[in-house]
């Protein structure tokens, strides 16, 4: 009997078994409960104890309001003790380190398929092209507006010119 394997109270209880794990290999899914409705008790919003709005740990009976504190809790000694989990760090060999460094070097040199390579010059050039297209659209809109606007014709034009009236409407020309 060692410190991680205390004696069992009843012979076949899985609750008392120690789980030995290494580092996390899977990602923690923070979005699994997004857009789900949960009914909470009346006093659920006060404190960390008990079920409430946020991430709930059944082993520790605590609720966490943000993902950072939830992740900290999952790695805390309190949670690991309650879930009877022992994390053993495996020391990497020289070959594994070299292999991992080679993998990341290849990742840096080869951009992912289907994604554009980051180029500042291209982005600036594209931005200027979009600005020019926007200016051209504005100019076309202004020309179309002037074509379609009603003009004074005949004698009324002369009379308006004598009176100093050039147009009706806004002062922006």
UniProtKB/Swiss-Prot annotation:
Q: Which GO terms describe its molecular function?
A: nucleic acid binding; zinc ion binding
- Signal sequence, start to end: none
The Gene Ontology biological process terms listed for this entry are: mRNA cis splicing, via spliceosome; mRNA splicing, via spliceosome
Q: Where is the protein localized?
A: Cytoplasm, Cytoskeleton, Microtubule organizing center, Spindle pole body; Nucleus
Question: Which UniProt keywords are present, listed alphabetically?
Answer: Coiled coil, Cytoplasm, Cytoskeleton, Metal-binding, Nucleus, Zinc, Zinc-finger
Q: Which PROSITE patterns match?
A: ZINC_FINGER_C2H2_1
* Coiled coil spans: 119-149
Q: Name one GO cellular component term.
A: cytosol
Which domain of life does the UniProt lineage start with? Eukaryota
Q: Which intervals hold the zinc fingers (Matrin-type)?
A: 55-85
Q: How does it assemble?
A: Component of the 25S U4/U6.U5 tri-snRNP particle, a subcomplex of the spliceosome.
Its name, as the record gives it, is U4/U6.U5 small nuclear ribonucleoprotein component snu23
Q: Which organism is it from?
A: Schizosaccharomyces pombe (strain 972 / ATCC 24843)
**Phylogenetic lineage:** Eukaryota, Fungi, Dikarya, Ascomycota, Taphrinomycotina
């Amino acid at each position: 009997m060692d410190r991680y394997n205390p004696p069992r109270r009843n012979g076949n209880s899985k609750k008392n078994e120690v789980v030995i794990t290494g580092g996390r290999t899977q990602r923690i899914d923070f979005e699994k409960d997004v857009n789900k409705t949960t009914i909470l008790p009346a006093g659920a919003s006060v404190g960390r104890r008990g079920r409430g709005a946020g991430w709930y740990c059944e082993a520790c009976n605590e609720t966490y309001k943000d993902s950072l504190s939830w992740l900290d809790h999952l790695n805390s000694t309190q949670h690991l003790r309650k879930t009877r989990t022992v994390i053993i760090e495996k020391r990497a060999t020289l070959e594994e380190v070299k292999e991992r460094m080679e993998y990341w070097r290849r990742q840096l040199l080869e951009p992912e398929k289907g994604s554009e390579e980051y180029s500042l010059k291209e982005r600036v050039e594209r931005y200027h092209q979009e600005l020019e297209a926007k200016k051209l659209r504005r100019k076309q809109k202004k020309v179309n507006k002037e074509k379609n606007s009603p003009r004074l014709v005949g004698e009324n034009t002369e009379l308006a010119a004598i009176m100093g009236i050039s147009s009706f409407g806004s002062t922006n020309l």
